[in-house]
């Protein structure tokens, strides 16, 4: 387990890594507080306009120049769906209407959980946001599969196109690496 915390936020004493509650945890032995560390939540949207989906080409690392669904870290005190709306605006300059939670995708090795919402674009206008080199709408046949930035986007897109065949959009759970 990797941790950067050096001092207790409760009493200011140094913390140690200690096996407790069945796993290594950051503990202050002075005041006995356990400092729980939790995965980062990444929220985003699979945005649909007519028969196309929105992808953004990343202008920042990691995976600069690769395509991705608009997504990013959830801010403190922000609702997941509001984060997806914000990220879509920041990356593609477009407004969306959230329909439902579509995929929950676990990346345990990166200590991240992705939540992608299924959303409709309010209009078909997309722009380049501050974190995108390019934003565009793609049909299924046009998706640049080998140029996708992250497995979470590939999972959401594959699942969307499978569900579209039946017209029933379920909520899906995925993990990388797949087990």
Regions inferred by a protein language model and the residue ranges of each:
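N-terminal leader/linker segments that precede catalytic domains of diphosphate-processing enzymes
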Residues: 1-62, 73-90, 94-125, 163-179
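Nudix hydrolase/Nudix homology domain
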Residues: 1-4, 130-179
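Short, basic/glycine-rich phosphate-binding loops at helix/coil junctions
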Residues: 63-66, 139
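Conserved acetyl-CoA binding element of GNAT-fold acetyltransferases
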Residues: 67-72
């Amino acid at each position: 387990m990797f941790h950067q915390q050096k001092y207790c936020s409760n009493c200011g004493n140094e913390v140690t890594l200690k096996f407790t509650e069945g796993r290594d945890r950051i503990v202050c032995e002075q005041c006995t507080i356990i400092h729980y560390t939790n995965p980062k939540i990444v929220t985003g949207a699979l945005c649909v306009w007519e028969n196309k989906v929105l992808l953004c080409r990343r202008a920042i690392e990691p995976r600069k120049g690769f395509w991705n669904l608009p997504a990013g870290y959830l801010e403190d005190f922000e609702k997941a769906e509001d984060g997806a709306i914000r990220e879509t605006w920041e990356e593609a300059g477009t407004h969306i209407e959230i329909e439902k939670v579509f995929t929950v995708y676990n990346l345990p090795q990166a200590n991240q959980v992705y939540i992608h919402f299924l959303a409709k674009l309010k209009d078909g206008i997309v722009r380049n946001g501050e974190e995108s080199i390019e934003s565009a709408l793609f049909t299924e046949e046009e998706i640049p599969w080998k140029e996708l930035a992250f497995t979470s986007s590939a999972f959401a897109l594959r699942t969307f196109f499978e569900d579209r065949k039946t017209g029933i959009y379920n909520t899906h759970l995925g993990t990388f690496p797949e087990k």
